[in-house]
């Protein structure tokens, strides 16, 4: 069967202009205009999706099939182009009958052309074919536009669903343009309103706990860049201003001994006029012991020195993935559970903004894994937030899972974050030893987010940093009072 792409090629119909016109009409639709005004960060993300839209539309036009009636008419037109005028005159009745049977838009005009001219000349033959071709071009263009209109409606429907989802989650997850772009990519999944409302709910809880959000940002961005001396660094000229006494006097600031005749004190000059003291005067002149005025001035000069440049390289501390382990034991239920989930959502926000990965593991009696920064990050986040914290505590399994994950090449610079109240059994010696090896040899950092003030020091001693967020009633009231 004839494809639309082949028909466009045969009739020299360009679909590019129609595709561009359709996309411009889509971008100018009131829904998108209002959305871009409300969420300017997502405008760049949607605009970046335009090449994919164009490719999808071209693919749809390329794979579409032409209706059988139009295919038959096109085949007849192609065969008619090969006929001479006498041969065409012989075939004309069959051609007219075919056009009538196919309900071709050109049927009436073709019949009028033959009936209004008693003699079918070569010029009339050429005119007949030209108008027939024009009719086919109009039909092909109409077919392209119909398909594009169907695709536009479908695309607009999909975009509206994604806009609704992205608009709801943008305040919670989109910190910058990079995060907005990743959020838009994640919104391509099939989600219902009731699903992502769970993220909105925890986003509102996080907004009501600004200290928790601040803690997540401090943890997520705790690595700072540092300058590192570079070997065989080139020499660089440094110019500094140095203050020193000037040779040109400016003011009298005391008396000194010297041999400056022009600055002698009057009593010294008086001794020169006394014959008995003249030799004494010359002796003191030679020994530079004459009393003279001390005149001082100040001057600045430029001092030029060379030294090696010691801060050539800037070693940015790597911002690698997050491997977050969340304690789902019974003691972490209630408000602790809300805080732990909201904290993971805040880390997801940091990961999206900094183009990092965020991997969640729940530990109780077994380990459940979620990746919140992948293409299906929103679905994974919803599944994570739907979990209930009612298990036991097996923190050793959590650390073993972290250690196993860090063996992979893509996790070589990962940061481990353990969220718990740390009311658990002591860690086995082999786990403590392996964690110390990762910290010492591979510079992995282990963070503890303590939800209780009663965590066991023996467990928490293993961490590089301990971030405390006491969820006790007294601490909650104090935080609320400070706000």
UniProtKB/Swiss-Prot annotation:
Identify the keywords attached in UniProt to this record, alphabetized: Chaperone, Cytoplasm
Cysteine pairs forming cystine bridges in this chain are none
Fetch the SUPFAM superfamilies from UniProt. Answer: vWA-like
Q: Which CDD domains match?
A: VWA_YIEM_type
Cell compartment(s), UniProt: Cytoplasm
Primary location: cytoplasm
What are its GO cellular component terms?
Answer: cytosol
Q: How does it assemble?
A: Homodimer. Interacts with RavA.
Q: What does this protein do?
A: Component of the RavA-ViaA chaperone complex, which may act on the membrane to optimize the function of some of the respiratory chains. ViaA stimulates the ATPase activity of RavA.
Q: Which family does it belong to?
A: Belongs to the ViaA family.
Cite the PANTHER family for this sequence. Answer: PROTEIN VIAA (PTHR36846:SF1)
Q: Report what the protein is called.
A: Regulatory protein ViaA
**Whose protein is this, by species?**
Salmonella heidelberg (strain SL476)
């Amino acid at each position: 069967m004839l494809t639309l792409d082949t028909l466009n090629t045969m009739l020299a119909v360009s679909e590019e202009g129609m595709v561009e016109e359709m996309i411009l009409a889509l971008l100018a639709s009131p829904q998108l205009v209002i959305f871009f005004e409300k969420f300017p960060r997502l405008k760049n993300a949607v605009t970046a999706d335009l090449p994919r839209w164009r490719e999808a539309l071209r693919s749809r036009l390329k794979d579409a099939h032409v209706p059988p009636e139009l295919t038959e008419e096109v085949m007849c037109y192609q065969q008619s182009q090969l006929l001479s005028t006498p041969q065409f005159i012989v075939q004309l009745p069959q051609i007219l009958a075919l056009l009538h049977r196919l309900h071709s838009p050109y049927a009436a005009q073709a019949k009028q052309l033959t009936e209004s001219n008693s003699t079918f000349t070569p010029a009339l033959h050429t005119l007949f074919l030209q108008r027939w071709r024009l009719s086919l071009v109009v039909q092909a263009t109409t077919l392209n536009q119909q398909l594009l209109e169907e695709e536009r409606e479908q695309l607009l429907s999909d975009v509206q669903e994604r806009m609704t989802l992205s608009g709801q989650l943008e305040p919670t997850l989109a910190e910058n343009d990079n995060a907005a772009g990743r959020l838009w990519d994640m919104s391509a999944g099939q989600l219902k309103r009731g699903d992502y409302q769970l993220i909105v709910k925890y986003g509102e809880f996080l907004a009501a706990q600004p200290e928790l959000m601040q803690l997540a940002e401090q943890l997520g961005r705790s690595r700072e860049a540092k300058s590192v001396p570079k070997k065989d660094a080139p020499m660089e000229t440094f110019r500094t201003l140095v203050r020193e006494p000037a040779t040109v006097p400016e003011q009298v600031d005391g008396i000194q001994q010297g041999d400056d005749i022009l600055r002698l004190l009057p009593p010294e000059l008086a001794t020169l006029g006394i014959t008995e003291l003249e030799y004494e005067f010359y002796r003191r002149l030679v020994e530079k012991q004459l009393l003279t005025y001390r005149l001082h001035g100040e001057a600045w000069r430029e001092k030029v020195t060379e030294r090696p440049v010691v801060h050539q390289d800037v070693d940015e501390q790597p911002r690698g993935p997050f491997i977050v382990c969340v304690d789902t034991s019974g003691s972490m239920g209630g408000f602790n559970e809300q805080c732990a989930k909201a904290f993971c959502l805040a880390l997801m926000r940091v990961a999206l903004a900094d183009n990092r990965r965020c991997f969640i593991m729940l530990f109780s009696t077994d380990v459940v894994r979620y990746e919140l920064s992948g293409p299906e990050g929103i679905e994974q986040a919803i599944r994570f937030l739907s979990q209930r914290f009612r298990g036991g505590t097996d923190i050793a399994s959590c650390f073993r899972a972290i250690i196993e994950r860090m063996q992979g090449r893509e996790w070589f610079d990962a940061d481990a974050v353990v969220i718990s109240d740390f009311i658990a059994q002591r860690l086995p010696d082999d786990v403590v030893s392996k964690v110390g090896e990762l910290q010492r040899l591979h510079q992995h950092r282990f963070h503890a987010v303590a939800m209780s003030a009663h965590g066991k020091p023996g467990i928490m001693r293993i961490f590089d940093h301990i971030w405390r967020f006491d969820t006790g009633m007294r601490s909650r009231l104090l935080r609320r009072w400070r706000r």
